[in-house]
Amino acid sequence: MVYSYTEKKRIRKDFGKRPQVLDVPYLLSIQLDSFQKFIEQDPEGQYGLEAAFRSVFPIQSYSGNSELQYVSYRLGEPVFDVQECQIRGVTYSAPLRVKLRLVIYEREAPEGTVKDIKEQEVYMGEIPLMTDNGTFVINGTERVIVSQLHRSPGVFFDSDKGKTHSSGKVLYNARIIPYRGSWLDFEFDPKDNLFVRIDRRRKLPATIILRALNYTTEQILDLFFEKVIFEIRDNKLQMELVPERLRGETASFDIEANGKVYVEKGRRITARHIRQLEKDDVKLIEVPVEYIAGKVVAKDYIDESTGELICAANMELSLELLAKLSQSGHKRIETLFTNDLDHGPYISETLRVDPTNDRLSALVEIYRMMRPGEPPTREAAESLFENLFFSEDRYDLSAVGRMKFNRSLLREEIEGSGILSKDDIIDVMKKLIDIRNGKGEVDDIDHLGNRRIRSVGEMAENQFRVGLVRVERAVKERLSLGDLDTLMPQDMINAKPISAAVKEFFGSSQLSQFMDQNNPLSEITHKRRISALGPGGLTRERAGFEVRDVHPTHYGRVCPIETPEGPNIGLINSLSVYAQTNEYGFLETPYRKVTDGVVTDEIHYLSAIEEGNYVIAQANSNLDEEGHFVEDLVTCRSKGESSLFSRDQVDYMDVSTQQVVSVGASLIPFLEHDDANRALMGANMQRQAVPTLRADKPLVGTGMERAVAVDSGVTAVAKRGGVVQYVDASRIVIKVNEDEMYPGEAGIDIYNLTKYTRSNQNTCINQMPCVSLGEPVERGDVLADGPSTDLGELALGQNMRVAFMPWNGYNFEDSILVSERVVQEDRFTTIHIQELACVSRDTKLGPEEITADIPNVGEAALSKLDESGIVYIGAEVTGGDILVGKVTPKGETQLTPEEKLLRAIFGEKASDVKDSSLRVPNGVSGTVIDVQVFTRDGVEKDKRALEIEEMQLKQAKKDLSEELQILEAGLFSRIRAVLVAGGVEAEKLDKLPRDRWLELGLTDEEKQNQLEQLAEQYDELKHEFEKKLEAKRRKITQGDDLAPGVLKIVKVYLAVKRRIQPGDKMAGRHGNKGVISKINPIEDMPYDENGTPVDIVLNPLGVPSRMNIGQILETHLGMAAKGIGDKINAMLKQQQEVAKLREFIQRAYDLGADVRQKVDLSTFSDEEVMRLAENLRKGMPIATPVFDGAKEAEIKELLKLGDLPTSGQIRLYDGRTGEQFERPVTVGYMYMLKLNHLVDDKMHARSTGSYSLVTQQPLGGKAQFGGQRFGEMEVWALEAYGAAYTLQEMLTVKSDDVNGRTKMYKNIVDGNHQMEPGMPESFNVLLKEIRSLGINIELEDE
């Protein structure tokens, strides 16, 4: 395997046995691709904005004299970049400009004669843009649009599984779901009549819709039934025989023909009888006259002579009717073929309950059902029905819907119209009747072939279309009203409805969520989440068990592990590692093609529908060198079931062992040894890990760490290869390799790093360079680590030395005992950044003022403020300190004569303002790391604002000029090369000032041209620099666009350092979570024979019942990894020669059959080996991929190599007594995470605070400064102890007895500790509620 310079710094030993056929795809592509489709110009007009415009335009006036046509659109440049939008609290968006053409036709002239054409570009609002990391910045906060899993449009056949009717009869139904428009349902009732519902309203007989489609009774019967033909000959009744129809019937008379009896009366007709009849080619048989009674006539029969209707279609025949028919000369009678087995009389029966008899009455009936209470007219009824399913404006199946519809009805073509046709409706009814007759199956709604993904782009397009449709109405009216000669397109269009619809979607849709930004993994998982909730989806309450359950089609598409615990379980899922969506929005997963029993490296993506037709082997099937299966029988999946197949039956093979799981679950080593429930907790808890002060890569990983860290976008990744030319804490400059440069550019890439910014969850985002000056880098190398990444690998926690043993009850019930060393070394110290804002408004009594001159506040309280009244950066503040001084004018109060006198003597006192300063919340203390002042346009900036502005300008100028210098240096080195090649002496050239170089002329024309080109570039560079600086200056100095009535906003950022302490929640990666019970002194911790104490003591009883054995294997393997690191460390300390080091490290990498990754250290230089050793001295990182991990024997081998006991257990000694513990203890290294459930955020105590308005009881919860609820069970406890007075106190003065508690407060202040309980307010509430029921109830005082 070839490693780049940066990758050679630290290589993970990989235990994976299966070769990596397909690299992990870019993990955010589901978001980025979908949005790209939405905004990029699509010439076909299938997707995105283009499709939305084409579906609404052209808009014609009601008279048809004019129309507004759409030509094209373009997105402008965003005003602010992403960072500026976050700081200013605005939306990162681009203006949408649309070119429209207004065409006016001549009124009197023949059709289509154009009178006037006007074309103009019109502004149509702002479209939020996606950042490079798949998020949106809306009002300054990063949000994610979660993809939705919804029912695909199309037709679905289902049954109620016998739950509706008491008899348990299974009722079948069909439902046509369009992408937009009315739903059409067909359903059977218990009497086997077929009904139709439109939009889930009341049901009508299904034949009404056929009559509305202009079918007569005869035509309807013709469509759905085969005919039985009777002929009357010589007063005998004969029937045309179709032998196949007789199968399974019992003969009610002798079946004979040509004097031969084929079946005797009462006998059952078998296949043998039918063969006999067919062989003798029997066409007609004689039947008794009674046989025809009860048969149903297939068409109208009229008496030719009188014109009288003898019997209408769908009437039952009786012997009298037969006689009448015979008399009037009808010798041939067509009846419907029905039987109880597989040709039910459903449509015939339905026609009998159908009240309508022609098209108009059917349309009226449908109109009455859709619009009850409105008087129907013919036109209204016709247009309503037409608009329901046959109008492109109101109804659209979409390409997906049409494809699913045609596939479901087994049609050849998969494309077609977006509206329904007569055939569509009839075919659906036919198939439903077939299913009722026992032919065909119902659909499985939870099958992923029937559910599709709706991603950002599609949802934004739908929202945009909604806005456009609103605009369409207004445009139509304007086209009809106005004087068209003077109007321009922009007078027609009002952009408000469009931007309102888009804004509403991005700002407040259920699927537009505040991004979970705890750590890089939680960001990535949030963007790959798939929700079944949201508009057009399910609701938590209605979702049953089946929808939430794991379905066989989830394999490789949706993760069976990662889903929230609680009410949303199974409704919110995560995309599997390799899954992607196809053009129709269905999830697909990759497989390797198997041809003639040989597994190839050809990759095919299959959707759930296609997968059902193949036999697919698992990824861990053993193959030989050529790719043949080793075993004769291979475990495979086919049609959702797993079983053994012979090797030549296999069609495909899984791509990778981690194909089944999501990114979160693929980061859990030894996942295959954990119980599923615990794995779920492990995957979910990794997302809650807080980035530690110094990230520490996991010793035992799965090899997915690098992919997650790079794709999450928190690291700085090299866009092109080159050499590091400059590096400091906030910038990295790369001189690009010659072969990767664009022609005529300076070849310098500058990466500005993010420093100490706040994430959505108040954790700290900070990037630190991990390359040094002069190092070569390649494209895709990590240049700087972000939060929770270490050398470009995801590092959510710390490697801790753990021991599994009880310790004095401090690890009872999942508690965790932690050594003081962990606190001292700041292993789990985290930085949290809080944003506190102070808003100065314009009030009725005058403007609020931000100032240091605050009434009734001592000097000490103002010591941290500057003269503008704003805290200075670097100040250490604690709860209650003033951060921003602000005074609010208060209403004039009536002054007493004494006050008036004092005022007159001492002048104007500051009593007409009240202190409304921003203070640090209680329980928070930290350091001020940044202050930002935003001032409204036209309001004078204070001194602090001007200082900040000046500083920003200085910084911007410094950044830009440094950038310019770097680019200039690159350019001049190329100019020098051209000059020297053109014959100028290098020494003389270096004596000449650089600016004069461009004045030199060369004789060689080609070189002279090159020189002139470079000179042009130089001028352009300087011009560009001036332009950038001017733009920056304008942005910095312009006023801010603040909300109405707001004059100034001051934002103060506090950095809070949180050390680990009892009460904090910690967890491993296997769902093994617990709370810290005690921080133990180092000297009291158990230690080994070398005197090394353990860091954490965990309870062994937490493992067997939970069945997450993965943690034990991880501990052993971690121990081995550390042991090897220790040996390398010892060798480095002894300064042994490189050859020995190289040999030992090579041995470690070669251990276990590494097919996937042969690390060949012979290709490394000595310096590279030394640097690798330096990075391995704390432990050799190991990858053990999911379902393909290290085996027990391999772990033992590795332990042996690290000179450690192969049992993984060692003798420990009690730190307090020095005595050896009775038995050996499992000790090793486990990766522990500190979760974002910190005791500091949860600890809370209430003094007198706010009360609920109605019940007058204290509020609940920390955010409301609430009290602790003394609930029903606590009352029982006091009752049980007979503590009557305590109980009375709890229910009255400590809760909602308003007078009692006020009096009590006064008494306490006076030092009188007595109480008089009164009437609790909740009793009065109860009285009022009873009175509201009309029962007067009064409390009489005795």
UniProtKB/Swiss-Prot annotation:
The modification N6-acetyllysine is found at K1022, K1200. Its EC number is 2.7.7.6. GO terms for cellular component: DNA-directed RNA polymerase complex. Gene3D superfamilies: 2.40.50.100, 2.40.50.150, 3.90.1100.10, 6.10.140.1670, DNA-directed RNA polymerase, beta subunit, external 1 domain (2.30.150.10), DNA-directed RNA polymerase, subunit 2, domain 6 (2.40.270.10), RNA polymerase alpha subunit dimerisation domain (3.90.1800.10), RNA polymerase Rpb2, domain 2 (3.90.1110.10). Keywords: Acetylation, DNA-directed RNA polymerase, Nucleotidyltransferase, Transcription, Transferase. GO terms for biological process: DNA-templated transcription. Belongs to the RNA polymerase beta chain family. This is DNA-directed RNA polymerase subunit beta. It comes from Shigella dysenteriae serotype 1 (strain Sd197). The gene is rpoB.
